[in-house]
């Protein structure tokens, strides 16, 4: 697919074995992988990486390459594991129509986990970031809407914003956005799906999402960059 990068704000920001950890929140035992570089300074950044629908923390850790980047640049990476819905699919609760009866509080879980990791590993509370693929990208947008004071910037990949919370997204603080999306994405459509033809629930098109964050961030200009599809087999 053709891929377009949208930058609303410029940010600058293997050898250690990732460890599967457990964290109890909301009467549920949650799991996550944590990667700490072999050498890391106090108050280093923390990056959350969220997997997609039906995927796993281990899977996105393996294919994202974030551990190698963290090792080189000196930041911690956390890969939270979603819970399982009634059909046995792993997910983060962002409001899909078929998850209307799911009560898991993923936002609360991530905020509590961030505070735990910041305190336990002496990581920076003001340099916490989020990215994710598809459902994980939507989780990043949701966190930016609801807890912008916790996340310095977010970088959703192939994600969108559900209409149910797009219409109420009015954060107190601006959040830099690095939006990555395929213009021919046949799962999460670039133009959105307000009629819910795809069955996920009504969601917003990428152009509308960018316009929303331009307004929130008081951004006068948006930088678009288009990349060629160099791997036709990657979906």
Which positions does each model-derived feature cover?
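Sec-dependent N-terminal signal peptides
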Residues: 2-16
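Serine-hydrolase catalytic-loop signature spanning alpha/beta hydrolases and amidase-signature enzymes
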Residues: 54-56
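Conserved acidic catalytic loop of the alpha/beta-hydrolase fold
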Residues: 108-126
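Structural cue for short, hydrophobic secondary-structure segments
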Residues: 49-52, 79, 179-180
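The feature captures the conserved acid-bearing segment of alpha/beta-hydrolase catalytic domains
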Residues: 152-235
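A domain-start/cap signature at the N-terminus of enzymes
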Residues: 15-46, 58-64, 69-73, 102, ...
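Cap/lid segment of the alpha/beta-hydrolase catalytic domain
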Residues: 81-105
């Amino acid at each position: 697919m053709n891929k377009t990068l949208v930058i609303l704000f410029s940010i600058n920001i293997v050898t250690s074995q990732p460890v599967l950890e457990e964290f109890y929140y909301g009467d549920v035992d949650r799991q996550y992988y944590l990667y700490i570089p072999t050498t890391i300074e106090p108050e280093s950044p923390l990056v959350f990486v969220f997997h997609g629908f039906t995927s796993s923390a281990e899977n996105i850790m393996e294919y994202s390459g974030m551990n190698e980047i963290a090792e080189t640049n000196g930041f911690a990476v956390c890969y939270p594991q979603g819970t399982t819905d009634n059909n046995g699919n792993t997910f983060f609760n962002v409001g899909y129509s078929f998850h209307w009866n799911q009560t898991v509080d993923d936002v609360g879980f991530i905020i509590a986990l961030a505070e735990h990791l910041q305190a336990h590993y002496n990581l920076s509370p003001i340099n916490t970031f989020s990215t994710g693929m598809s459902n994980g990208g939507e989780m990043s947008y949701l966190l930016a809407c609801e807890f912008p004071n916790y996340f310095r910037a977010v970088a959703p990949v192939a994600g969108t914003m559900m209409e149910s919370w797009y219409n109420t997204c009015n954060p107190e603080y601006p959040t830099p956005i690095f939006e990555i999306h395929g213009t021919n994405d046949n799962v999460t459509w670039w133009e959105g799906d307000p009629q819910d033809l795809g069955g996920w629930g009504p969601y917003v098109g990428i152009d509308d999402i960018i316009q929303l964050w331009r307004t929130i961030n008081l951004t006068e200009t948006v930088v678009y960059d288009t990349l060629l599809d160099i791997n036709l087999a990657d979906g």
